[in-house]
Amino acid sequence: MADFVGAVDQGTTSTRFMIFDHAGNEVAKHQLEHAQILPRSGWVEHDPVEIWERTNSVIQNALRHGNLSPDDLAAIGITNQRETTVVWDPRNGRPYYNAIVWQDTRTDSIAAALERSGQGDVIRRKAGLPPATYFSGGKIQWILENVDGVREAAEQGHAVFGNTDCWVLWNLTGGPDGGIHATDVTNASRTMLMDLETLDWDDELLGLFDIPRSMLPTINPSSHPEAYGQTRTSRPLRAAIPIAGVLGDQQAATVGQVCYAPGEAKNTYGTGNFLVLNTGTELVRSQHGLLTTVAYQFGDSPAIYALEGSIAVTGSAVQWLRDQMKIIKSAAESETLARTVEDNGGIYFVPAFSGLFAPYWRSDARGAIVGLARYHDNGHLARATLEAICYQSRDVVEAMEQDSGVHLDVLKVDGGVTANDLCMQIQADILGVPVSRPVVAETTALGAAYAAGLATGFWQDTDELRTHWQESKRWEPQWSEDRRAEGYAGWKKAVERTLDWSKVE
């Protein structure tokens, strides 16, 4: 009998395969990083072939670590870094270009031109998104316009698009030999090409980017027993296992954090931060810089929508301290170093390396450290980096409360940065509400597993999934209201200093 569900978690810096039991507990996992390709300032790419090879390896190694066979898996889910764009030849599986990553800003002129022409409001109304470098539509257009032969190939049916969920799914289900070219509603909602009401590709939006509809994958529910097919026996699993769930990473974390009721929210701390608030079957149009997106759709049930605040640089700011500045040797050292000081000493670090995402949407912003004096040392910079993660989250929480009218009583958190206890305490202090971390911190992979397991009957319903969630640790706010207000005022002033640095044509 198949007693487990697996999940491919294809992220920005790594790919992992995780295996869960009926109680939602982790049984085994394996993870491998892939290269970050940085050809020039503002450009971020990944090698799709390397990602597929890593996917093969992590599946095989996780099964081996768990002493399991493929037949022990009832189903597989896929979750992924959203927006990251792959265009490949379906005849042979060869990418025409590297994957253009969600952080990449090369399409800033495309986004700016759409806004100037008045088309930004069309995109907001239909897709729920502002025209921004973040989303896939402009990335596809850039490849069509700048990579030799791709436009012609697309017109002949020899170039197809997918985010990395689609790329992994296509390869797992056969690749050039009948691979399924499909995605789910959550990933499609991040392209600027899907109408949120019809849950289908929109011809007017496609026309804005001059993208042939034939390039695009079929859009399916996030959880479905048949829509995504089965793994091919010639592929890494050597068995036909149903792929029954697909979700973008932040929507998967929302499912994994069991935020199934309107008003429930979670914040994932990874390379960036992503705060998602369930708004139920109601489409809430943001007036304060947030995104309207699809949270999930299970089977034939109506789609559940969400408001999202996406922050480009949070955990990657800690990586910057490690890799570029070399003031720490590991991410964990950021906490140790930050604890050497009592506060930030009056300095603020705004890590706008890729511009500012929600709620500002300023691609012209660039990173800044302000308030420096000779007194400051590495401890203050480490502390300011952790505070930057938390202040950016407060920006989003305030916008979310204005849009929804929902006051946050507790913030559910997950992701790698939540292992940093000091950062989570700072988050509670800056927000003024408790912060709660679950026992199973890998909620992104868990959410993909839940979607697959629900579709195949491994789990009965969301009520059963709620019983799995347990709190591991809670942080209560300790700052006074005066300190909280003073700190946030300083942060807002620092943000102003980052604007108008990068010219947008």
Swiss-Prot record:
Activity regulation annotation text: Inhibited by fructose 1,6-bisphosphate (FBP).
GO CC annotation terms, alphabetical: cytosol
Role played: Key enzyme in the regulation of glycerol uptake and metabolism. Catalyzes the phosphorylation of glycerol to yield sn-glycerol 3-phosphate.
Residue sites binding ADP per the record: T12, R16, T271, G315, G416, N420
Record: residues binding sn-glycerol 3-phosphate: T12, R82, E83, Y134, D249
SUPFAM superfamilies: Actin-like ATPase domain
Organism annotation: Streptomyces avermitilis (strain ATCC 31267 / DSM 46492 / JCM 5070 / NBRC 14893 / NCIMB 12804 / NRRL 8165 / MA-4680)
Descriptive protein name: Glycerol kinase 3
Domain of life: Bacteria
